[in-house]
Amino acid sequence: DGVAPEGYHAMSIYPEYFKIDGAWLLAEDSRMDCVPVCEDGRIFVREFRHIRAGDAIVCGRTESGEQGIYVHTTGFDPAPDGEGELADAGRHADNFAFRLGRSRETAFSREYDELYELLKHEREHGYVVWVMGPAFSFNGFSRTAFSKIIEAGYVDAVFAGNALATHDLEGSYFHTALGQDIETQENRPLGHYNHLDTINRVRLYGSIGRFIEEEQVSGGIMHALEKKGVPYVLAGSIRDDGPLPCVLGNAYDAQDAMRSHLRKATTVVCMATMLHTIATGNMTPSYRVLADGTVRQVYFYCVDI
């Protein structure tokens, strides 16, 4: 168990087709760096830790169809313009370049406008996963803003760590984050105890939901998630305080919990967390197969600076 045969094929982020018994099968639920397993006439993509002796694992490392493996890298490229040319970003999608028509210093207001329109569509037709770092819990305005996004129905799941939840709850309970006022950033006397006292209190109640209910906590990100019934995955870290009782300390349990949502995700927005962004990116394919068989693009946004 847990060992692939020599010459196994490793998945990419792209749609991949496998010729099995004369028919081309699409891997419907993919994940990069995992292996394709043929089972009951379908292709399942599994992590190495989940493969078992006897699994029919696809072997082959060419990707243009000659070994019965086709990786479709251009399925979501921009449509040609009036002269038959692809948009600049599409032409250079496989090449690193400092400038793709616009520099990194260029304002991204156009992208935000597109994201607004996308989220309006996804609220009714998709599954939006947000991946968040603790920076959002250190500012009262950002906590309020994201709470409104949750309440408005633009959030289907949240991935974070112990820190985001801890300091957000600290903000609701003590009006501080790491002992600093969440509005003025002024240090509070003995404020360095506040996040520990918050963790301790939540552990007393056994869950974030019960802590919010019993302590009549209002406002903040975790309160909005609990009130709206939005699921969240809190993945543990080796540097966590506490942790909160719902934090998953086993990294692979956390991966599996995250992937259960990413199997449905159509848009992913990652903000202020390099670790969780990379982890989520590794588990997110560029496409999603809908119930009616439609293959659609998955949108992935990363805002880290």
Language-model segments: what does each one mean?
Residues 240:
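Positions that flank functional sites
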